[in-house]
Amino acid sequence: MDIKHEVARSLLSIEAVFLRPQEPFTWASGIKSPIYCDNRLILTAPEARDLVERAIAETVKREYPQAQVLMGTATAGIAHAAIAAHLLGLPMGYVRSSSKDHGRQNRIEGKLVPGQKVVVVEDLISTGGSVLDAVDALREAGAEVLGVVSIFTYGMKRGVERLAAAQVRNVSLTDLDTVARMGAQEGYITEADVARLLAFRENPSDESWIQAESQA
């Protein structure tokens, strides 16, 4: 089994990724979703944590061999960046969602030298907004952002297009398609549910996948 499927199975087993097409979740945006992702749970599950953090480190070594610093996104990416940086023997810092309103008013925490080659560690990619905000802050500070390593991506068209437009490369450990198929294989959902999850990924604002469920 490759790492993409190993991570998918691990996330499902600890319910960091939860599939519930029969009872959709409601996101803050109001979108009805058959999937919910909380990668913070990885930190509470030692076996899953070991798998994921080693996979992040291996991905950095393989995809971004010139990396000099890892930068986590606040707050969810911080712990993952810290553990992976420890495994790699690299410096680590993180990017706040906004500058502090006291002290040195830092947006970027940790030492960053202009020109350093940085890899951003993110837990989840949906529309790409938060990670692109972090990349922008790092670029403004003079960093050369090599790309992103994320634990999970929904693979939404908007997110893919926004990353491409900003010339930001993202490598995810696993994705919605893999999780959906692994979910069916492991008995979490049915084969019919896989199609509903993929329909959701294609157009999250179109709730016809829910109607398809009720008609099935």
Regions found by a protein language model. Name each.
Residues 1-121, 129-216:
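PRPP-associated nucleotide enzymes
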